[in-house]
Amino acid sequence: MQCYTEILPPTGVTHALAVPFLAATSDDLIVVRTSLLQIYSLHKVASHAEGADAQQESTKLLLEKEYSLSGTVTGLCRVKVLNSKSGGEAVLVAFRNAKLSLIEWDPERRGISTISIHYYERDDLTRSPWVPDLNNCGSILSVDPSSRCAIFNFGIRNLAIIPFHQPGDDLVMDDYGSDLGEGISTDHDLGGGTVADKAKEGIVYQTPYAPSFVLPLTTLDPSILHPISLAFLYEYREPTFGILYSQVATSSALLPERKDVVFYTVFTLDLEQQASTVLLSVSRLPSDLFRVVALPPPVGGALLIGSNELVHIDQAGKTNAVGVNEFSRQVSSFSMTDQSDLALRLENCIVECLGDSSGDMLLVLTTGEMAIVKFKLDGRSVSGISVHLLPAHAGLTSIYSAAAASTFIGDGKIFLGSEDGDSVLLGYSYSSSSTKKHRLQAKQVIDDSADMSEEDQSDDDVYEDDLYSTSPDTTLTGRRPSGESSAFGLYDFRIHDKLINIGPLRDITMGKRLSTNLEKTGDRTNSTSPELQIVASQGSHKSGGLVVMAREIDPHVVASISLESVDCIWTASLTREEEAVSGTSEKMGQQSQRCYVIATEVKGSDREESLIFVVDGHDLKPFRAPDFNPNEDVTISVGTQESRKRVVQVLKNEVRSYDFDLSLTQIYPIWDDDTNDERMAVSASLADSCLAILRDDSTLLFLQADDSGDLDEVVFGEDVASGKWISCCLYSDKTGMFSSIDRTLSEPVKNDMFLFLLSHDCKLFVYRVRDQKLLSIIEGTDGLSPLLSSEPPKRSGTRENLIEAIVADLGETWSASPYLILRSETDDLIIYKPFVVSTGPVEGIHSLKFSKETNSVLPRIPPGVSSTQPSGSDYRARPLRILPDISGLSAVFMPGASAGFIIRTSASAPHFLRLRGENSRSSTVRFCKLPPMTRFDYQWTLKRVHLGEQVDHLAYSTSSGMYVLGTCHATDFKLPEDDELHPEWRNEAISFFPSARGSFIKLVWDHHLQRQDSVILIFHLHSFSLGADEYVMAIKNISLEVSENTHERKDMIVVGTAFARGEDIPSRGCIYVFEVVQVVPDPDHPETDRKLKLIGKEPVKGAVTALSEIGGQGFVLVAQGQKCMVRGLKEDGSLLPVAFMDMQCYVSVVKELKGTGMCILGDAVKGVWFAGYSEEPYKMSLFAKDLDYLEVCAAEFLPDGKRLFIVVADSDCNIHVLQYDPEDPKSSNGDRLLSRSKFHMGNFASTLTLLPRTMVSSEKMVSSSDGMDIDNQSPLHQVLMTTQNGSLGLITCIPEESYRRLSALQSQLTNTLEHPCGLNPRAFRAVESDGTAGRGMLDGNLLFKWIDMSKQRKTEIAGRVGAREWEIKADLEAISGDGLGYL
């Protein structure tokens, strides 16, 4: 009984689409990361150019919303629909297994809305016995540029056609608008009269689409047996698409017999008659063509991309081609221009239009190199194609990784998404000479059109009347009538923004975090580091490197000081007023700012002593301030009046103000003016010149400073004075969002001060301070519904006990925006995003709403707290801290047992990141900053180290504290000239060689991963070069016996390699044994004090594909070819085999359950074997095997008490859980591994790692609640999974009782939740069980959606499940990853 939880989402971008989605005029970007849909908006930010003083404008991406989808996305297209909710366009999303979803943006809910979902999984379409299953077939989605219909090719030869209603469907063709975005698209405005008038005359459609229909491709043409690619074309009045296909399957091995067998045919569709017409067909095209790219005007037609050439076909069927390497002539007889000197490989390349009038296109190769594709235009046709690599002066010439998706955004920007590296937002511009030339050319075109004769104009009229006209509008495109489109070399590219990607994660290891210099000197008070850290190899080719993952924020400690009985701490930064105004000298400018650190020491129940320090560099010096809290009253809050240059201290009984030197300037007592009763302050909020204080009778005291800086009370209305409040918060609105809901203002006012009050009945009141005007009342805040508004909730049932509500900015400096953060008495954090929507038929009337953000982090239960005692009973004295600037981020800190930060970046939603450290109170005060070079976009922190090489394997050397890397780089592969069987290889005369890999073994020290200059340091470390055509297949740190006499054991680095020279040459392998030794370092580089010393080397027959330690005598288990051998290291450096087992095809995985001798052997084709190794005598025995012949990509043991499970990841993104149970009758006396469950995760697994599991806070509470010693029933192991797209998953065993609760909860959530895109999570996970004995694996990400539900629905579902809320929270905490307490 297991549960799969995705700790980190996919990071590699697979699809991208630029579309006005959030509004009709917005610039938005839809990004898909396998099964994660993200919506970004584009914002222009002023930035300083490197090496220049002037500012230049950059465009940044800001995440608006993201959705985890229950499906794998295979296609993405934009569709113009009638009367969309946002006024923008809709998006058609294609999924694996022939599903389509049409979604749009709903501004009322601030989320996507599913218009429709289309399933094409019917048996009558896929029941043919010789057709593969849908999940084994690719699909192609394309939408007509005018959004009249979409075509969806699925199941190889099925074509689904979905018509879309457009303005003028029932009118004459005079209302035709061109495909360039003119005409039809202008009628999408909801307020426009054109659409309304047409709706009155025509039909009002209930849906934006008409019924779809499915046709076999053979009905279009019987010869379409092997479709390759298709796309809708521009400049046609009727929906018209071009399809690339062949009558026989293309094959490189059968090239002499199947040369130039590809056809390109253009069909036009008649949607009413469900018929098609062939417009043109081109035969005998190169057989390596794989994609059709429709080209907009001025070029038009289609560009066909092959592995060695580019072919352009216009609307009349005229062809132009260019070969980009020397093989283009050998693989095809098609006529093409020769540019073989470029030596380009076009496999899986990306081509994107640059969007200008020249028709140039950007070509991105799999290496990341970029080139420009230019079309020579001769009148109204293309007369030639040329390809030009970007020169060095173009600024950016490569993105260093293959692009998986691209989209033209407009305004000189292109987005390139990648699965192998970071995705980039590129900007391009022209030099001044190019701009001037384009203007002259445009002017020439206009002049030519003005001087055109009547006969020429009549010819143009003929083209306009032609149904399939190839004449574009010259005045619209500004295209020159002839000549090359533009002079080459005038493009300048630069990167505006990046989306970080840590995929593919190729290998993973765990190592100890080495001590810092402060810790080595004995100052352990500075240590906040974890025991272990996870280091993974990530990226491909030149974007490769390492990534260090941490479960919590590991702060960089700058200094520390020991203070006894410290209770709270504050900081205050002041600027001397007279120096700020008149200070001009350098000396005065340096002394104008002073930063104080104020700590309080507990002296008694109601007494505190204030300790004051002044910051001097990285040191703290005591500062004497006799006026500062001389009565030792309890401090509630300390803040700074920025504009008044005062420090304000809120005590229980009074408010004290201090000047620059902390001399007392004012005392304001806290009492009730109506009754003259003395009151005490319990919380306070300070913002600039305003101070809001909540007293012990739940009344509000509001103070505001005058021009002199003195505080005076400001009386609000009677509703505020008589109200009872739980929490108060002041917020300075920098964006003008809250002022926009005031209908009396013509435009929003920025930097207005607002007061937020949470009443006892949990209504949120929003006041503007300057005129005490009530702008909005948010009802039912304690209901925690997904959407908060001024309307009362429909169902008023169970409520959450809220103790605090604040409004604060979250995000980076340029993207900080307000968020409402609610805190419950159990430390649950609920985050809402405020937004303003238009209400009513009259424009200008807006209402304020709050949209709930996803938060899957559960608070820890403090030690010593029982389940019946609320953990937040004393948290009023520990309020949330608003941090306006912490390392460039605006964040909120939560103290207490679950101490951490609420952080939001431009690429992430607000999320909670825990602060590392024990919960126990200590006398040490540490002064820290956020760790440098660290990303906070996810639930775990990520620190990347760029190496510029692909790292395939890595291991941690426990004896030296070094990381050993197996890297590779691309090299040319040449046939061996010394082969006696093939003497003809010596006469090979080619210059364009195939690509192979050259491997190195390198060392990296942990300190290099922590330093900011690690990129430079790594290349000074020791490396060991392997032979030609020799690849690193495995690296392991193994404790080997190094002496046969003394039986001494040492930790050695064992490396397995393979010599691969082609399919027809048998592969060989080699086993290397290294020891990391200490040497005399280079004086200029003291970090080079380690070296790899070769201890042993053993060449073997067959590739060494996997390694593992086995047994207790220091032996290594080696998978070599079709055998698995146990070898021991001899003193002469050879490795002697002592036991072996014959395998079948290709051993992909070898794992041992440490110290037991039990091992699993995974075959890439024949499944997994469970074997055992015995030492007396040396023997390997087969215990059981899998009879389903799984394609094993990764495998690992998973012990659960007395049961032994084996987790297997196959090549179809599935997880299989097998069990070895010889007592089960179905196991055939233990010879068969029993299949217990199957779970589809949607990602290709790269590694599975068995890790120990620690107790979570809820389990610690249960174990400590009873004084008797009880057995720990919690599981002791879990499996960490890495994937090719950068995601990180965790498989956890759960007890029977918890499984029943969570299984029932999963069924309830599947049936009751509204799932994005209308998908079914149960169908996506496709859980299969082995009869009645098997239990399906649970989906942890679906279970965590219970946390984000409203309080009423959570209680209802918990009641249906038959569990209490704290029990479900405890179960969710166990599967959340908190069991990795040592990380």
From Swiss-Prot:
Q: Mainly resides where?
A: nucleus
Compartments where located: Nucleus
The intrachain disulfides are none
Positions of the region Disordered? 441-482
Gene Ontology MF term list: RNA binding
Pfam families cross-referenced by the UniProt entry: Beta-prop_RSE1_1st, CPSF_A
Question: In which domain of life is the source organism classified?
Answer: Eukaryota
What ranges does the record list as Acidic residues composition bias?
A: 448-467
Gene Ontology process terms (BP): mRNA processing
Q: Which UniProt keywords apply?
A: mRNA processing, Nucleus, RNA-binding
Which InterPro entries has this protein been placed in?
A: Beta-prop_RSE1/DDB1/CPSF1_1st, Cleavage/polyA-sp_fac_asu_C, RSE1/DDB1/CFT1/CPSF1, WD40/YVTN_repeat-like_dom_sf
Q: Which GO terms describe its cellular component?
A: nucleus
Family membership noted in the UniProt record: Belongs to the CFT1 family.
Q: What the protein does?
A: RNA-binding component of the cleavage and polyadenylation factor (CPF) complex, which plays a key role in polyadenylation-dependent pre-mRNA 3'-end formation and cooperates with cleavage factors including the CFIA complex and NAB4/CFIB. Involved in poly(A) site recognition. May be involved in coupling transcription termination and mRNA 3'-end formation.
This protein is called Protein cft1
Q: Which species does the entry assign this protein to? A: Aspergillus niger (strain ATCC MYA-4892 / CBS 513.88 / FGSC A1513)
Gene transcribed to yield this protein: cft1
